[in-house]
Amino acid sequence: MNKNVVIKSLAALTILTSVTGIGTTLVEEVQQTAKAENNVTKVKDTNIFPYTGVVAFKSATGFVVGKNTILTNKHVSKNYKVGDRITAHPNSDKGNGGIYSIKKIINYPGKEDVSVIQVEERAIERGPKGFNFNDNVTPFKYAAGAKAGERIKVIGYPHPYKNKYVLYESTGPVMSVEGSSIVYSAHTESGNSGSPVLNSNNELVGIHFASDVKNDDNRNAYGVYFTPEIKKFIAENIDK
């Protein structure tokens, strides 16, 4: 994909896909759902991998990258503080992997929309495997890379409050990878910010942060591609 096209699209046609008041879609949800029904799936069991690696914020998504450590977007974490809570892989009223308190927030120093969040190891509300965060979740591993044409999936909590924290999985092809940017054609909505972008082996390719406002067959979504520098930052900030 031409770089200038991507930049113009990001500048003019994208929304940040959390529901924190940063951006709102200009098309009705009914139209979006009809457009995406062939590649969006409701997750039935969040207690199996890869879904055990996903966590919910009040208005967005995150995922586990190591001991007591979650990744999300800067535009998500700026609305949270130490002591606030996250929920591990909730499944509406069918339970969750525990509720945990945030103990540290570290934003990536570059322009990329990446933020590390460390949580207290002991749950405020226990999960099915006890009170320990690491017993109730599964960290993701990195993919070797990604390229145009490969299939990816985005797993997260679109419209989390409205959808009662039901987890959804959306799939589509990679359109382009350039530097720390990855563009893909997968349907995402408000609340998907911070969702993991995974390859067919459920390995991390990047983190989702925005999507086009337009609603047609050319609607793209945007993520931060995990470069060696970003992986190094994450590794250095995993809880010890």
UniProtKB/Swiss-Prot annotation:
A single GO cellular-component term on record: extracellular region
**Which BP terms does GO give this entry?**
proteolysis
**EC number(s) on file:** 3.4.21.-
Q: How is its activity regulated?
A: Maintained latent until the signal peptide is removed by signal peptidase.
On pH dependence, the entry says:
Optimum pH is 8.0-8.5.
The places in or outside the cell where this protein is found are: Secreted
Q: Where is the signal peptide?
A: 1-36
Q: Summarize the record's induction comment.
A: Positively regulated by agr (accessory gene regulator).
Q: Which family does it belong to?
A: Belongs to the peptidase S1B family.
| Function noted in UniProt | Serine protease that cleaves specifically after the sequence Trp-Glu-Leu-Gln.
Q: What is this protein called?
A: Serine protease SplB
Q: Which organism is it from?
A: Staphylococcus aureus (strain NCTC 8325 / PS 47)
Q: What is the lineage of its organism?
A: Bacteria, Bacillati, Bacillota, Bacilli, Bacillales
Question: What is the gene called?
Answer: splB
